[in-house]
UniProtKB/Swiss-Prot annotation:
This is Leucine--tRNA ligase. It comes from Elusimicrobium minutum (strain Pei191). It comes from the Bacteria. HAMAP family: Leu_tRNA_synth_B. PROSITE patterns: AA_TRNA_LIGASE_I (PS00178). Its main location: cytoplasm.
């Protein structure tokens, strides 16, 4: 077989596409629009590794398919370029982050273009461009004017390495999400956004979104809506009441002590003199801990205040303790403890010898462990004999009638700590005037540009490095024209990504952030693709900003992203010696893949599948893959590795197989005889239509690996024919095009099949031909045959499910049960699992 220079073909076709503006879409669509968005990358100095393009390849397949289906496709790319890594690099090297960011963007753009992605580069944006962050600042001002941004000196998560505050969402297992350093608690003046005012809507509007259920669950859990009751406890000998929130008002008769947060404002007033020293010491210890450390259920600490509360349902005096597992920022900062029916309260009570009263009947009792299940109420006066839900309602009614409480809803979600004490971020457009107070910068003076400085070192005092630039800080108050100072904190890395999908629609507009008519026609994003790690960071923040803009009348739709899909992580093999040292691929003899050895010594190495990292020497650079195999093999292999959403290891044997397939396709495409006069067979025509249906459905469902399999089957049949009907030749190239655009476009052109393949209509299946093929399927419910159906061979999975659910006997055995899953075994069986 003649050696094929795929790299030459790649460059040729990419230039043709770019010269002819094939992926540029008018700002106002003419045909039905399809807005496909990738989560834009942070342009790091390391460039792309093979894991990054997985999502980009999926979106590109979808985009090319939609273009061929007649849509005006919006498919932009840009750069989320503010953030700590560029600033840290500037500190280490003395090179301004603006310079390194530009260089990194140039490299990322080159790498992405080399993959043949169908991006509309006329829409390119960069969050560090003043023409972009002018509008980020403008949106902040709208949030401020709406009363949703405020200053507060609060205990925050402080990273001593990054020397900046972090939002709760940026802390993972008590460590900084960015650098892994253990977080400290520190009181610092911050700008905070009232995301909590949107908690209900952020929760309710998840309904109807086509998002992965796991992501919806993460957002629901992060918002953490709790429905229960607020209860007022009198404090013995004091006028003040202690207010608590509980999701279990039915257990009030089992409340045997109370716990308040060490930060609770009432603590100092109620602590008895003999306990003041112990309480003060405990408060100091708690102040040094992070919220994560305080949540460690294995470390139960606390101090008795000497004070007592009165249980409002039975008049009993119960002790008031302080413990750091109660957080001031959640609920009321105080809890009623029911140790018989809460594991943490139980362990605390056991440690400190506090009373435990069973109020929900259990077979085992509560001598050895708390009972957290449902049951009948006992030892609870008027609630005795009731079930939990009934007793909750009865207790809330009692509290309301007595004037000591009532129904209440709370949220786990906290307001968003928005400011950062670093240089490389958007300046917050606020001025501090000794006379006028906090004053917004006039919109006509935006953008407030970052000053060029030579020292980016964070101060570590809670002040941004900008505080050390007096010529920038000192300004004039927009209201009174007196001396004033600029806000020196900067915005977090999430600010620019909160609204970038809107700017892509109208990136050059200098009058507004997006033309209203364009926004109405092009929003929302029809398909958003990116990592699941952003579920409670970017995705939550972006939805919040969008809802503010919706309330202000700037956007038409309530939600920004109609459909969301996550790619799985691409892992890689690492090779490690017995001494624990990792070795790079160039050091390893892989002639026997089952027994990797060190080239220099022959030492046997341990092979593991791990996340790519420089320290493990298993990062695979796409430039190397492209140089060896070309873009189409790279793209197609990433889609063929396994289910899109699953994690899977990069395997050089796999890409070799795809490369061989594409070489066969190209050689066949160059040499095979093809003409309209060549006759087809019914079997081949049926296979053609089946393949069209299969590939189309699989692209829509992100089942790219099975689409590739279907294409391989179709090709194997075509490659056995000496004279291929032109209809089949064109169909195969068109179906393969989204996966391998370069060689298909090249063959399309060389065989004079017509104008650009990417602008050719997507093939249509002969449905009448497929309808002649009916098949019978058995139906099982929980493993037992309950019926059968006859469907057409072209029926989609959804059509098969719908017909199976309507089969009378199947319907009978599903009645009153929850559907768990449906497994369709092609041409044989439908297995329905219910519970």
């Amino acid at each position: 077989m003649t050696e094929i220079n795929f790299q030459e073909i790649d460059k040729k076709q990419q230039k043709i596409w770019e010269d002819n503006n094939l992926f540029v879409t008018p700002r106002l669509p003419i045909n039905p629009k399809f807005y496909c968005l990738d989560m834009f990358p942070y342009p790091s100095g390391q460039g792309l590794h093979v894991g990054h393009p997985e999502g980009y390849t999926a979106s590109d397949i979808l985009v090319r398919y939609k273009k061929m289906k007649g849509f005006d496709v919006i498919h932009p790319m840009g750069w989320d370029a503010f953030g700590l890594p560029a600033e840290n690099y500037a500190i280490a090297t003395g090179v301004h982050p603006a310079i390194t960011t530009k260089n990194n963007i140039d490299n990322f753009r080159r790498q992405i273009k080399s993959l043949g992605m169908a991006y509309d580069w006329t829409r390119e944006i960069d969050t560090t461009d003043p023409n972009y962050y002018r509008w980020t600042q403008w949106i902040f001002l709208q949030i401020f004017k709406k009363g949703l941004a405020y200053e507060s000196t609060v205990p925050i998560n402080w990273c001593p390495s990054c020397k900046t505050g972090l939002a709760n969402e940026e802390v993972f297992n008590g460590n900084c999400e960015r650098c892994g350093t253990k977080i400290e608690s520190k009181n610092i003046r911050q700008w905070v956004l009232k995301i909590t005012e949107y908690a209900d809507r952020l929760l309710e509007d998840l309904e109807g979104l086509d998002w992965p259920e796991s992501t919806l669950a993460m957002q629901r859990n992060w918002i953490g809506k709790s429905i229960g009751a607020e209860v007022d406890f009198e404090i013995d000998g004091h006028k003040e009441n202690l207010k608590v929130f509980t999701t279990r008002p039915d257990t009030l008769f089992g409340a045997t002590y109370m716990v308040v947060s060490p930060e609770h404002p009432i603590l100092e007033q109620i602590t008895m003199p003999e306990q003041k020293a112990a309480v003060k010491s405990y408060q100091e210890e708690a102040a040094a801990k992070t919220d994560f450390e305080r949540g460690d259920v294995n470390k139960k600490t606390g101090v008795f205040t000497g004070a007592y509360a009165i249980n409002p349902v039975n008049g009993k005096k119960i002790q008031i303790w302080t413990s750091d597992y109660v957080l001031m920022g959640y609920g009321t900062g105080a809890i009623m403890a029911v140790p018989a029916h809460d594991e943490r309260d139980y362990e605390f009570a056991k440690k400190f010898g506090l009373e435990i009263i069973e109020v929900i009947k259990s077979d085992k009792g509560v001598e050895k462990e708390a009972f957290t299940g449902d049951g009948e109420l006992v030892n609870s006066d008027f609630l005795n004999g009731m079930k939990v839900e009934q007793s909750k309602a009865a207790m809330i009614k009692f509290l309301e009638e007595k004037g000591v409480g009532g129904a209440k809803t709370t949220y786990r979600l906290r307001d968003w700590v928005f400011s950062r004490q670093r240089y490389w971020g958007e300046p917050i457009p606020i001025v501090h005037c000794p006379k006028c107070g906090v004053v917004p910068v006039p919109e006509s003076e935006l953008p407030v540009k970052l000053p060029e400085v030579t020292n980016y070192e964070p101060t570590g005092t809670g002040e941004s490095p900008l505080a050390n630039v007096p010529e920038w800080v000192n300004t004039v108050c927009p209201v009174c024209a007196g001396p004033a100072k600029r806000e020196t904190n900067t915005m977090p890395q999430w600010a620019g990504s909160c609204w970038y999908y809107l700017r892509y629609l109208d990136p050059k507009n200098d009058k507004t952030f997006v033309n209203p008519e364009i926004e109405r026609e092009c929003d929302p994003v029809d398909c958003y693709i990116g990592g699941a790690e952003h579920a409670v960071l970017h995705l939550l923040y972006s939805r919040f900003w969008h809802k503010v803009l919706y309330d202000l009348g700037y956007v038409k739709y309530k939600e920004p992203y109609a459909k969301l899909r996550h790619q799985g992580m691409i892992l890689a093999y690492s090779y490690r010696g017995e001494d624990g040292v990792y070795h790079g691929y160039d050091e390893v003899d892989l002639s026997d893949l089952q027994n990797p050895k060190l080239k220099t010594t022959g030492e046997k190495l341990n092979s593991m599948v791990e996340k790519m990292s420089k320290s493990k020497k298993n990062v695979i650079n796409p430039d190397d893959i492209l140089h060896k195999y070309g873009a189409d093999a790279f793209r197609m292999y990433e889609m063929f590795m396994g289910p899109f959403e699953a994690s899977k290891p990069w395997d050089m044997k796999g890409i070799e197989g795809v490369n061989r397939f594409l070489k066969r396709v190209y050689a066949w495409g160059e040499s095979v005889e093809t003409d309209e006069v060549f006759l087809s067979t019914k079997e081949l025509d049926i296979l053609r239509s089946k393949t069209i249906v299969k590939v189309s459905e699989d692209i829509e469902k992100f089942n790219f690996n099975t689409a590739v399999s279907a294409l391989m089957i179709y090709f194997n049949d075509l490659s056995k024919i000496k004279g291929v009907p032109l209809k089949h030749f064109k169909t195969f190239l068109a179906l393969l095009h989204p996966f391998a655009p370069h060689i298909t476009e090249e063959l399309w052109s060389r065989r004079k099949c017509g104008p650009f393949l990417v602008k050719t209509a997507w093939p249509e299946a002969d449905i009448m031909l497929l309808r002649s093929e009916d098949m019978g399927l058995g139906i099982q419910v929980n493993g037992k045959v309950r019926g059968s159906i006859t469907v057409n061979a072209s029926a989609s999975d959804d059509e098969i499910k719908a017909k199976a659910f309507e089969e009378p006997n199947v319907k009978k055995h599903m009645e009153g049960k929850a559907l768990v899953k449906v497994i369709i075994v092609p041409k044989r069986m439908v297995n329905i699992v219910v519970k």
